[in-house]
Regions:
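Carbohydrate-active catalytic/glycan-binding domains of CAZyme proteins
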Residues: 1-526
Length: 526
């Protein structure tokens, strides 16, 4: 049966998956955004529902002023003895342009009730540094030993080559304390200079080591190794590495970072990341959705005790697998702010210091009290973001904002990072209120508002991003500017683009708090 890929569109990279009974649970990276690590649920591998996040409290996650691409990387989810475990790491400093990184200490959180996000524990930190942590519980069942694998730079660089030298290391750990109980050993390095995303499983008499190699851009690929001895190796390279290879001219690119799951019928599957660029004439345009890397699903078969993923073929947008079916995620989504808590799927940039919003002070409105940081500051602004998951759609909100200071603003934003964003909002000067459109490149433009009505703000998404507003019921849309998709995806001068495009709501003051609230009546994609 054929089905559509990606199965979880938009900014959802580095998938990790586990099955408990008939239920599948999948998690992805969140980088510098809060809450951290979304948890998706499915019973058929096709329709996935966001059911919560693993890191929702300041006692679990403190992400403050990291560069774009910092924060929480590539978590792994596992289940053992009635307990769900999630392993991850959080970069507080990430400046690859200067080869300046602080290797984070990994950690894990756990719960017995994955449906209640408040039950996840505070983190237990590992002694071992690195990223892409994985703990396999296969070995706990055999001799009580737990192995932790992670990625960091080799102690001794490769002589004569300018490589990243990111390699897979493994050590034993005391899970209760996180303390290492053995020295780490290097078990896999790559000629590309990057071996990461390690997952170790046991099947039959073999242990299998899966690694993502070549970096997460055009050279990305997935490799496999096996050992009859144990997780320390020796490791035998698979006969058909990489397990598949998508190139820079394919409809799906940058594929890799796979994790495996077996369904209740004995079928095996792999989830992995990929991007969907759009063809524009003779060139590819970076995907506003998939540059953040999306979650794909493909079949896995075992032949001669080696895994064969997707039949060894390239990953495509239409895939085949037993028992699956065609499904398209709907464009329409709306939040009327009618509940006492924010809907799942809203994100903050960084961990907020204070409570700067309310859903109860004015029922049926999201009330924001803008904090002292504008959107260009690395700190956490008063801003709520949602992932764009369809290339062609319209984002819309209705705003009531009557500022008393010339140094405050509220509106809606097209967001990539604090270097690259485009906003349309309400401000005031001595003559009254006006609309300001600030594109990601170029100068701001302003349009006078003649009355005190609520303002509808919108962003049309497609071949470009177009920004407009309506003043009052029945007013025509005033389209006041646009931003090319290329400009919206501009690479930052520091950090990296690991996320896809997001849209959001904000209120801000220039080094001061907004004393007047901004009230949003709704937010929607349509």
């Amino acid at each position: 049966m054929t089905y559509n890929n990606p199965v979880i569109p938009g900014f959802n990279p580095d998938p990790s998956i586990v099955r408990v009974g008939e239920d599948f649970y999948l998690i992805t990276s969140t980088f510098e955004y809060f809450p951290g690590i979304p948890i998706y649920h499915s019973r058929d591998l096709i329709q996935w529902t966001l059911i919560g996040h693993a890191l929702t409290r300041t006692s679990q996650l403190q992400v403050h002023t990291p560069e774009p691409g910092g924060g929480v990387w590539a978590p792994t989810i596992r289940y053992h003895g009635g307990i769900f475990y999630i392993m991850a790491a959080s970069f507080q400093r990430y400046r690859p342009q200067q080869d300046d990184r602080v290797w984070p200490q990994g950690f894990y959180v756990k719960t017995m009730d994955i449906w209640n996000e408040e039950t996840w524990s505070d983190p237990i930190f590992f002694d071992q540094v690195g990223f892409d942590q994985d703990v396999s519980f296969n070995f706990l069942d055999e001799d009580g030993t737990i192995y932790l694998s992670s990625t960091y730079r080799k102690i001794h660089p490769t002589p004569g080559d300018e490589l990243k030298d990111f390699a897979i290391h493994i050590c034993t750990v005391d899970l209760a304390t996180g303390h290492s109980t053995s020295e780490p050993q290097l078990i896999r390095e790559s000629l590309s200079g990057v071996a990461e995303g390690s997952h170790i499983i046991k099947r039959g008499r073999y242990w299998y080591l899966f690694t993502a190699e070549g970096g997460t851009e055009g050279g990305h690929s997935e490799w496999v190794h096996r050992s009859e001895v144990g997780p320390l190796g020796l490791w035998e390279l698979g006969p058909n590495n990489p397990l598949w290879r998508n190139g820079v001219e394919d409809e799906v690119q940058n594929t890799g970072h796979a994790d495996l799951v077996e369904d209740s019928k004995g079928n095996w599957w792999a989830v992995l990341l990929g991007v969907r660029p759009t063809r524009q004439g003779n060139t590819w345009e970076d995907s506003v959705l998939g540059n953040g890397r999306e979650t794909f699903l493909v079949t896995l078969e075992w032949k001669n005790d080696w895994p064969v993923i997707n039949g060894g073929q390239k990953i495509s947008l239409i895939s085949q697998g037993p028992g699956l079916y065609q499904f398209e995620t709907t464009v329409a989504w709306r939040d009327d702010f009618s509940e006492s808590r924010m809907q799942l799927g809203w994100y903050r940039k960084n961990t907020p210091f204070v409570n700067d919003y309310s859903l109860t002070e004015r029922p049926g409105r999201l009330r924001l009290y803008g904090g002292p940081y504008n959107l260009s500051v690395p700190a956490c602004p008063t801003m709520f973001l949602r992932k764009q998951i369809h290339r062609v759609c319209r984002w819309e909100t209705k705003l009531s904002f009557h500022p008393i200071s010339n140094q405050t603003e509220a509106g809606t934003v097209l967001w990539l990072n604090y270097f690259t964003y485009s906003s349309i909002g309400i401000r005031k000067d001595d003559q009254g209120r006006f609309i300001r459109f600030q594109p990601s490149e170029g100068d701001a433009t302003e349009y006078r508002l003649n009355d005190q009505t609520d303002i509808t703000l919108m962003i049309d998404c497609g071949t470009k991003y177009r920004f407009g507003y309506c003043a009052g019921t029945g007013d025509d849309v005033h389209w006041i500017g646009s931003v090319s998709n290329g400009a919206a995806m501009k690479v930052p001068p520091v950090g990296a683009i690991f996320i896809g495009m997001m849209t959001g709501l904000y209120a801000l003051g220039e080094r001061q708090r907004c004393l007047v609230p901004a009230d949003f009546a709704y937010a929607e994609f349509k």
